[in-house]
Amino acid sequence: MTPSLANFLWSLVYGAVVLGLLFGAIVFVSQRDRVRRR
């Protein structure tokens, strides 16, 4: 595997992790707000 390909794969992995954390935080906050608003 070439270093550039490895860097590309790692960037994809880190991007997926960041998106997952953001999505999880948004879902968590929306769930908590829905409970509090009721």
Curated annotation (Swiss-Prot):
Spans traversing the lipid bilayer = 8-28
The UniProt entry, under Pfam families, shows:
PsbX
> Which Gene3D superfamilies does UniProt cross-reference here?
Single helix bin
Q: What is its main location?
A: membrane
Task: Provide the topology term for how it sits in the membrane.
Answer: Single-pass membrane protein
- Cysteine disulfide links: none
InterPro entries, sorted: PSII_PsbX, PSII_PsbX_type_1_subfam
A GO BP entry: photosynthesis
Q: Where in the cell is it found?
A: Cellular thylakoid membrane
Keyword terms, alphabetized: Membrane, Photosynthesis, Photosystem II, Thylakoid, Transmembrane, Transmembrane helix
Kindly state one GO CC term assigned in the UniProt record.
plasma membrane-derived thylakoid membrane
Outline the subunit composition.
PSII is composed of 1 copy each of membrane proteins PsbA, PsbB, PsbC, PsbD, PsbE, PsbF, PsbH, PsbI, PsbJ, PsbK, PsbL, PsbM, PsbT, PsbX, PsbY, PsbZ, Psb30/Ycf12, peripheral proteins PsbO, CyanoQ (PsbQ), PsbU, PsbV and a large number of cofactors. It forms dimeric complexes.
Q: Which family does it belong to?
A: Belongs to the PsbX family. Type 1 subfamily.
Cited function: Involved in the binding and/or turnover of quinones at the Q(B) site of photosystem II (PSII). PSII is a light-driven water plastoquinone oxidoreductase, using light energy to abstract electrons from H(2)O, generating a proton gradient subsequently used for ATP formation.
Q: Which HAMAP family match?
A: PSII_PsbX_1
What is this protein's name? Answer: Photosystem II reaction center protein X 2
